[in-house]
Amino acid sequence: MMTESEFIRASEALFEHIEDQIDENGWDFDCRFAGNVLTIEAGDGAQIIVNRHTPNQELWIAAKSGGYHFAEQNGKWLATRDGRDFYDVLNEALSAASGEAVEIAEL
């Protein structure tokens, strides 16, 4: 398990990476980071929320498709419920919100 400061650094790097990937690829999303929350808004107003839950050292995604909790396991963020990869869930949510294929590369 990471220390709290390691978790915060890792999650901040992940949030920055997501924003950079969206900007570099020109996808139609607006990103806002405030506190522990990265809000990604599609052109039609659909939102995907990515936040960190420091006490549990989890990343959470909230989207129209549902809510997901991810814990770090062997260098990957995997869903606590079904083991799905963070990037797979995020890319599906972003693709559904934008109507185009979105592929955020792993950090």
From Swiss-Prot:
It holds the Pfam family Frataxin_Cyay. One of its GO terms (molecular function) is ferric iron binding. One of its GO terms (cellular component) is cytoplasm. The keyword Metal-binding applies. Transmembrane segments: none annotated. GO terms for biological process: iron-sulfur cluster assembly. Keywords: Iron, Metal-binding. The keyword Disulfide bond does not apply. InterPro entries: CyaY (IPR047584), Frataxin/CyaY (IPR002908), Frataxin/CyaY_sf (IPR036524), Frataxin_CS (IPR020895). SMART domains: Frataxin_Cyay. Belongs to the frataxin family. Involved in iron-sulfur (Fe-S) cluster assembly. May act as a regulator of Fe-S biogenesis. This is Iron-sulfur cluster assembly protein CyaY. It comes from Neisseria meningitidis serogroup B (strain ATCC BAA-335 / MC58). The gene is cyaY.
